[in-house]
A protein has these predicted regions:
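Extracytoplasmic/secreted envelope proteins and their assembly/folding machinery
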Residues: 64, 87-94, 116, 120, ...
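Sec/Tat signal peptide C-region and signal peptidase I cleavage site
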Residues: 23-29
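Active-site acidic/histidine clusters and adjacent loop/turn architecture
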Residues: 55-107
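Acidic helix-start/capping segments at beta-turn-to-alpha-helix junctions
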Residues: 102-118
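Bacterial N-terminal signal peptides
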Residues: 9-19
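Loop/turn elements at helix/coil->beta-strand transitions in domains of secreted/extracellular proteins
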Residues: 47, 99-104, 158-161
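Catalytic cores and adjacent binding grooves of peptidoglycan-active enzymes
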Residues: 36-41, 122-193
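Mature N-terminal segment immediately following signal peptide/propeptide cleavage
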Residues: 36-54
């Protein structure tokens, strides 16, 4: 009788473990299939893209290629492979400001060295070794979101560089080292990266 009770108890424990294991397996499977989505509008080309770029922790190569083309140097047409973590910053930033499905306006994506030098010759706010030339940076704004609030949300993420350009109404985000600057602000330092 005692052996039967122990066997019954063990069977119950194994059944509970199987149930818990399958439900946690489903949760893991669900999170591994979570889709990460971006809606972007390029202010210089007029192009739009609405794309799932990552499922779970796996970036989608075809989506990356489409985003690389979308973010090409609009002056030369040159394309460079983007650091996909920039896409995560955009997605997380839109969520952080309460607009997870917002269409993000792209002011500038990839820049060739030629384009970067062209811009540097016209503005002191363009860095000589810009992260844009490595396809690690994007300049953005989100319609309906104050750019100062967008900058503050980007700073709160604590990932990479955050530049604030209040006169031009955009925020720069990149995957370089963590740092911040403001071009055209009197209260923040004005170094450019």
């Amino acid at each position: 009788m005692k052996n039967a009770a122990v066997a019954c108890s063990l069977a119950g424990v194994f059944a509970l473990a199987a149930i818990l294991g399958s439900s946690s397996g489903r949760a893991a499977e669900s999170s591994s299939l979570q889709e990460h989505h971006l809606r972007l509008y390029h202010t210089h080309t007029g192009e739009r893209i609405d794309i799932v770029y990552r499922r779970g922790d796996q970036y989608i190569p075809e989506a990356e290629a489409q985003l690389d083309h979308f973010l090409r140097d609009h002056r030369t047409g040159d394309v460079k492979h983007y650091d996909p973590h920039v896409f995560d910053i955009l997605s997380d930033l839109a969520a952080a400001v309460g607009h997870p499905s917002a269409e993000i306006e792209i002011i500038c994506g990839y820049r060739t060295p030629w384009s970067n030098e062209f811009l540097r010759s016209r503005s002191a706010g363009v860095a000589k070794n810009s992260q844009h030339m490595m396809a690690h940076a994007i300049d953005i704004r989100i319609p309906g979101v104050d750019t100062l609030a967008l900058r503050n949300a980007a700073l709160a993420l604590g990932r990479g560089g955050v530049g604030y350009y209040p006169r031009s109404q955009f925020v720069h985000v990149d995957t370089g080292r963590v740092r911040a600057w403001c071009y055209g602000c009197s209260s923040l330092h004005t170094n450019t990266e």
